Amino acid sequence: MVFEGHLVGTGLKVGVVVGRFNEFITSKLLGGALDGLKRHGVEEADIDVAWVPGAFEIPLIAKKMANSGKYDAVITLGTVIRGATTHYDYVCNEVAKGVASLSLQTDIPVIFGVLTTETIEQAIERAGTKAGNKGYESAVAAIEMAHLSKQWA
């Protein structure tokens, strides 16, 4: 037997957690995610968005959303751009681990849409220019995973 999630979001409730740091990028990721959700049938009234200060704060609010029982999936969006210190490495590692563990802890799909880039240019490319929009891609993944995970509910 083959299991697949379909890409029709009608009736799904989705939470989105967005890091405010590097907002000129994260706002474009959010725009892409909202566009992706709506284009696939998720009603605007069924989408909740929570802004947090930065990427490091994303896992806590994503966990609270996932544990609330209100959402079929949670999308996490943020942007971490390498600077001159090791801060980038710590933030990227902790955010990735935190978000990755949430699906296992909560049984709700939590999608990792946090950009971790070497340069501002790379982040811009992934927020709606030549490399697509990772927010949109995260929305599609959330819809697919919400349906797929319900097959074992």
Swiss-Prot record:
Superkingdom per UniProt: Bacteria
GO biological process: riboflavin biosynthetic process
GO molecular function: 6,7-dimethyl-8-ribityllumazine synthase activity
Amino-acid positions noted as binding (2S)-2-hydroxy-3-oxobutyl phosphate in the UniProt annotation, renumbered to this chain: 84-85, 126
TM annotation in the entry: none
GO cellular component labels: cytosol; riboflavin synthase complex
Residue sites binding 5-amino-6-(D-ribitylamino)uracil per the record: 21, 55-57, 79-81, 112
EC code(s) of this entry: 2.5.1.78
Pfam families for this protein: DMRL_synthase
EC class: transferase
Catalysed reaction equations from the record: (2S)-2-hydroxy-3-oxobutyl phosphate + 5-amino-6-(D-ribitylamino)uracil = 6,7-dimethyl-8-(1-D-ribityl)lumazine + phosphate + 2 H2O + H(+)
The keyword Transferase belongs to this UniProt entry's keyword annotation: yes
Keywords, alphabetical: Riboflavin biosynthesis, Transferase
Keyword Nucleus attached: no
Recorded metabolic or biological pathway in which this protein acts: Cofactor biosynthesis; riboflavin biosynthesis; riboflavin from 2-hydroxy-3-oxobutyl phosphate and 5-amino-6-(D-ribitylamino)uracil: step 1/2
Residue positions of the active site: 87
Subunit structure: Forms an icosahedral capsid composed of 60 subunits, arranged as a dodecamer of pentamers.
Function: Catalyzes the formation of 6,7-dimethyl-8-ribityllumazine by condensation of 5-amino-6-(D-ribitylamino)uracil with 3,4-dihydroxy-2-butanone 4-phosphate. This is the penultimate step in the biosynthesis of riboflavin.
Family: Belongs to the DMRL synthase family.
Name used for this protein in its record: 6,7-dimethyl-8-ribityllumazine synthase
Gene: ribH
